[in-house]
């Protein structure tokens, strides 16, 4: 089957499936990004989460946090207050963990060059743990992610191990991370619009030269945040310089799995 036709079939199948996430719909903060990507023939989103504060309870015999085997005590895509967590903790009989998870977005791309465009946008927007994977059937997936998270145990075997004052302190950190995550999402959307507009203009004018130039420029990037000058403003550049908890490198991996 022709590669374009096969990708089109994959996209139609994915977008026609029901949303089996807990929320059952796309998070408000990423709706525009998802719509923009799915409106382009070379992309479609397979999963997304705009970022959330969650309180999980795991079994008393479990050594690792595994969300599929946990009880979700609290889930919020907005800033939380201490009382929300205290009330939720009263339902815990095992080990409760407070977490903040930043944006995660998975996009299947028609070809590697398309994924490279999105990867540059993600890096420039502060999602510096983003990466590309290529499956054995040629499925190219771009994951937008960062290490801007938080995970702290609060109780053990139903007993609260920290003070309410410390919970309030943790929530201030989590809420701050939530606000920073939202700013990164906004930067990502703005950069994505610019990148796709530039791509459309270049494709319509010099399609063959565009592909060759795009591949060369991607390979030569040593500092993607400064190389992609169409996306990074002076203000954004200062913000990105302070993102000490993110890996500044490019992650492009090829795995022999199928996606």
UniProtKB/Swiss-Prot annotation:
Pathway it works in: tRNA modification; wybutosine-tRNA(Phe) biosynthesis
Gene Ontology molecular function: any one: tRNA methyltransferase activity
SUPFAM superfamilies found in the cross-reference section: SSo0622-like (SSF111278)
Pfam family, one: TYW3
Basic and acidic residues bias locations: 200-216, 226-241
GO biological process, any: wybutosine biosynthetic process
Enzyme Commission number(s): 2.1.1.282
Catalysed reactions, semicolon-separated: 4-demethyl-7-[(3S)-3-amino-3-carboxypropyl]wyosine(37) in tRNA(Phe) + S-adenosyl-L-methionine = 7-[(3S)-3-amino-3-carboxypropyl]wyosine(37) in tRNA(Phe) + S-adenosyl-L-homocysteine + H(+)
One Gene Ontology term, aspect cellular component: cytoplasm
Gene3D superfamilies registered for this protein in UniProt: tRNA wybutosine-synthesizing-like (3.30.1960.10)
UniProt keywords, alphabetically: Methyltransferase, S-adenosyl-L-methionine, Transferase, tRNA processing
InterPro entries from the UniProt entry: tRNA_yW-synthesising, tRNA_yW-synthesising-like_sf
Region (Disordered): 200-259
Function (record text): Probable S-adenosyl-L-methionine-dependent methyltransferase that acts as a component of the wybutosine biosynthesis pathway. Wybutosine is a hyper modified guanosine with a tricyclic base found at the 3'-position adjacent to the anticodon of eukaryotic phenylalanine tRNA.
Family recorded in the similarity comment: Belongs to the TYW3 family.
Entry protein name: tRNA wybutosine-synthesizing protein 3 homolog
Organism this protein belongs to: Sus scrofa (Pig)
